[in-house]
Amino acid sequence: MIDLHPNIAPLAPLLGTWAGPGAGEYPTIQSFEYLEEITFGHVGKPFLTYQQRTKARDDGRPLHAEVGYIRVPAPDRVEWVLAHPTGITEIQEGTLTVGGDRITMDVKATTIGLTASAKNVTALARSFRITGDELTYTLQMGAVGQPLQHHLAATLRRTPA
């Protein structure tokens, strides 16, 4: 087993796979429910790997996926570097708070990259709360002429290894 890099030791409780239900809404689409799986891993370097995918709760059709990395450049700071197969990349930066069995991350996009065919996403922000074996998050999005606002929320549980 590769040792965890000391820079990301505060994020060690994230390691593993998390799964559970979520719900989404946005003014330009119908509300929806989904099932999500997130896996956090590491390779011994100063970042976590991140892989996420969702499927529709009603019929299991694939909905979304993203991959990336999480870095801790300072004890109270966190950076997310993500790529979406829909032609979107995002760099999010924000705060990291670790205390006991609780981790809180609040990040906001500082850079969003779009391919020519990607949806016009102009703003993204995420809030993560991890307590023991429960991970909750919300995601806000500004896109297609709409201001930054609530888009997604989910509660995931750690899955057995």
Swiss-Prot record:
UniProt cofactor note: Binds 1 heme b group per subunit, that coordinates a highly solvent-exposed Fe(III) atom.
Motif (GXWXGXG): 16-22
Annotated pathway: Nitrogen metabolism
GO molecular function (one): heme binding
Enzyme class per UniProt: isomerase
Pfam families reported for this sequence: THAP4_heme-bd (PF08768)
Gene3D superfamilies cross-referenced by the UniProt entry: 2.40.128.20
SUPFAM superfamilies linked: Lipocalins (SSF50814)
Catalytic activity entry: peroxynitrite = nitrate
Residues at which heme b binds: H151
UniProt keyword terms in alphabetical order: Heme, Iron, Isomerase, Metal-binding
EC numbers: 5.99.-.-
Cofactor(s) listed: heme b
Domain notes: Forms a 10-stranded antiparallel beta-barrel structure able to accommodate a hydrophobic ligand in its interior. In fact, this fold hosts the heme group, which is located in a wide surface cleft.
Database matches in HAMAP family: nitrobindin (MF_01297)
Subunit structure: Homodimer.
Job description of the protein: Heme-binding protein able to scavenge peroxynitrite and to protect free L-tyrosine against peroxynitrite-mediated nitration, by acting as a peroxynitrite isomerase that converts peroxynitrite to nitrate. Therefore, this protein likely plays a role in peroxynitrite sensing and in the detoxification of reactive nitrogen and oxygen species (RNS and ROS, respectively). Is able to bind nitric oxide (NO) in vitro, but may act as a sensor of peroxynitrite levels in vivo.
Sequence similarity: Belongs to the nitrobindin family.
Name by which UniProt lists this protein: Peroxynitrite isomerase 1
